[in-house]
Amino acid sequence: MNKLAVLAFSILLLLSTILWYLANGSLNEYLKSQIELQGHYYSGQEASLLRAEFSDNTNSAQLNQLTLANLTSYQAKNVLSVDQVFIELSAQQNSSLLTKIDKITLNKLIINIEENKEGVSNIEQLIQIISLTLAKDYPQSYPAISAKIYAQEHPELDAEQYAKNHPEVGVITEHTKAKKSRGKAKPKMMIAAFNIKELELNITKKGITQLVLKQNITVNNIGGTEGIEMNQIGGEILLNLLKLAQN
C-alpha cells in the first residue's frame, strides 16, 4: 500500500480537515481524535472512541467502542453505540484525490430511541441537526433544506411570489449550487459497501421500552462513483445510521 493511501485513510469516516501524516505523532491517535471531533461537529454531542487501529499490511482498520452521547433532555446516556467497526480499504487506489473503501462492517449497532412530552424523538432532532449542518456546508447536496435556510436568513423575500416567478430556479438555485473551488482540488472518498451485522433498537414511548432486533442491514453506497468531499463523509455516515431507527 502506498504512503499516499495511508495518509488519505487517516482522515476516514468523521473528519474535518485534510491533514497529512504527522511524523511525530500516532496515526491511530490522529484517526481517533478526528472521529471524535467530527462526531461532535455534526451532531453537537460528544463522540467517544476507545481505540482505533490501522494496519497497512492488510489495508484495514478496526474501531472499538464508538459512542455518541444522547441529547440532554432524554434519559439514555448514548443515542448510539457500536462495539466494533471493521474497515476495508481498496487495494487499488487509482487517484490520489479519491480514496476508495471497499467495505465498512459494524458488528453491533445499538440505537436508543426516545420521545419527549411533545412526541418528538431524539432521533428526529439529531437528524435535523445533522441535516442542517450538512446543508449549510454542502448546499448543492441538500437544495431543499438549503433553500429553507436561505429563506429564513432573508425574511424580506416573498416566498410565494418568488415561487411563482422562479419555480425551482433563480436565487435558490444560485445559492445551492456548488461554489467554485479555489486552489487545489479537494480529496474525496467513496464507500462501496456498508453492512451492519446486528442492529438493536431500544424504543421508549411513554415510559415503556420495546426491543427490536434486526440482522444483516445494508446501507446504501456512500459517495457514489465519484466520491464526496472527505469532510462530508462523517455527516453522511451519521445521518444514514440514525435513519435506520426510522425504518
Language-model features, listed with the residues they occupy:
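Generic alpha-helical scaffold signal
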Residues: E29, N57-S60, A76-S81
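N-terminal leader/targeting pre-sequences
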Residues: Y41-S73, K197
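Secondary-structure transition motifs
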Residues: L68-N247
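Short, functional N-terminal and low-complexity linear motifs
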Residues: N2-L7, R51-S55, Q93
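N-terminal type II signal-anchor transmembrane helix
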Residues: M1-S43
